[in-house]
Amino acid sequence: MNTEDAIRRGQPGSYQRVQLPICSSVALPTPSSAECSFHAALDSRVSGERFGQPTNEELSNFLGNVCRIRYIDRDDRNRQKRCVASMGALHPAHLLMYLRSMGWCVYEPSGHSLGLLPVREESSKQVLQLVDEHAPAHEGAVICLLSDYDLANNYYENCMPLLFRDAGVLMGHAALVAAAYGLSFRILGRTGTATTESLVVGIKFTAIATGLALLGSKRTSELQGRV
């Protein structure tokens, strides 16, 4: 990988943020406040082992406190303030999820909703098989980060390393949010790269796979059946 430092361009180009193509949207409920302290979240953060199917409320709490938009810059609408930090306030990573109840979707931070994505079935199968190698028989949500290379390149020369650093910050933030809400979260060591980058049909930007993770309830269907 090229490890040269990124250089901010003296004058950004004309590129405007592009959204992923969606077939339909499902609104999420309003996020609720976490009941634990920041210290407690830090102390309880561990890589998850069991992943039950997350509820809409759990998804809302997690996604709303990771990617929700707080503010959009008036002079440059590519720059946004969200819960998580990002290079130059660009937030180039799109957070995709595979949910058993919906299939592949993307979190839409402006409307706090999930957008159903058109995907290539063979690519989907390969990505899910890759995740199953890490966590066989899980019931959780697969998280995939697809970063917009063109957006970052509009502002920085040699922007590729920045995309991975940015995704790392997002994943670390997500791990703490999951801990605060009592959810299981595990960052996976692989991203699926070319397979993940070809997952979505009709994508309008250069997509770079920058992260793969699992999110779920700590109560699996197996444990629920014993109650």
Language-model regions: role of each:
Residues 171:
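C-terminal substrate/ligand-recognition segments
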Residues 1-167, 181-227:
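N-terminal accessory segments that position/regulate proteins before the catalytic core
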